Design a protein with these regions (language model features):
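Family-specific functional microsites
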Residues: 5-174
Length: 174
C-alpha cells in the first residue's frame, strides 16, 4: 500500500493556457501568495502537505515508549467514531452538541456562498474538501476556517489508544 500522506494534492488539475484542465507539477500555487494572515496560510498548507497536528499524522510517528499506532486506531479526540484525518476534522466531525466545530462550518458555508453563490456543495466529504481547497476564489475564508478548526483540535488532548487494543497478544509456544 502506498503512503497516505499528501493525498489532497494527488491528481489535482490546474487551468491550462487553453482554459482546459491539465496536470501541472511545478507552479506557484494561489494559496502561497494570499494576502492573508501567515498563521492561516500555514494552517492551509499544513492540511495540504499533511504536516498538521491531527491524530492521523501524529500517531503515525514512533515516540518514546510508544510504537506507531495503526491508522484505523487513530481515532478522533472528540467523537472517537472515525479516524481523525483532514476530511473528518474539517467536514464530518460533529463532536457533541455544544461543540464549536458545527458553528464554524456553518459560518464558513455562509461565507463561501456569499463569495461563490453557485458553489456545488458535494455530499461526498472528500470531494467537498478538495473543491474548497482548490477553488481560487475561496482560499482566504477556507484558510481562516482551517486555522480555526485546527485551533479547536489543538485545544483538546489527542486520544491515544492503549497499545493492547491494537497490538496482537504474544502467543507462547508450549
Amino acid at each position: 500500500m502506498g503512503s497516505t500522506k499528501c493525498y489532497l494534492l494527488k491528481g489535482r488539475l490546474e487551468l491550462g493556457v487553453s482554459g482546459g484542465p491539465m496536470s501541472v507539477v511545478r507552479k506557484l500555487r494561489h494559496y502561497l501568495v494570499l494576502p492573508v494572515i501567515p498563521a492561516h496560510r500555514k494552517a492551509f498548507t499544513s492540511i495540504l502537505f499533511s504536516t498538521h497536528g491531527l491524530a492521523v499524522e501524529r500517531l503515525r510517528w514512533r515516540e518514546r515508549y510508544r510504537a506507531p499506532v495503526p491508522r484505523e486506531w487513530r481515532l478522533c479526540r472528540f467523537c472517537r467514531a472515525s479516524v481523525e484525518d483532514e476530511v473528518h476534522a474539517l467536514i464530518d466531525c460533529e463532536g457533541d452538541i455544544s461543540h464549536p466545530l458545527v458553528p464554524l462550518r456553518e459560518a464558513m458555508r455562509r461565507e463561501v456562498s456569499a463569495i461563490v453563490p453557485d458553489f456545488v456543495w458535494h455530499s461526498d466529504s472528500l470531494s467537498l474538501l478538495l473543491c474548497l481547497l482548490h477553488d481560487r476564489q475561496l482560499p482566504v475564508p477556507v484558510a481562516k476556517f482551517i486555522y480555526d478548526v485546527l485551533a479547536v483540535f489543538s485545544s483538546v488532548p489527542m486520544y491515544v489508544p492503549a497499545p493492547f487494543l491494537y497490538t496482537p497478544l504474544l502467543q507462547t509456544q508450549a
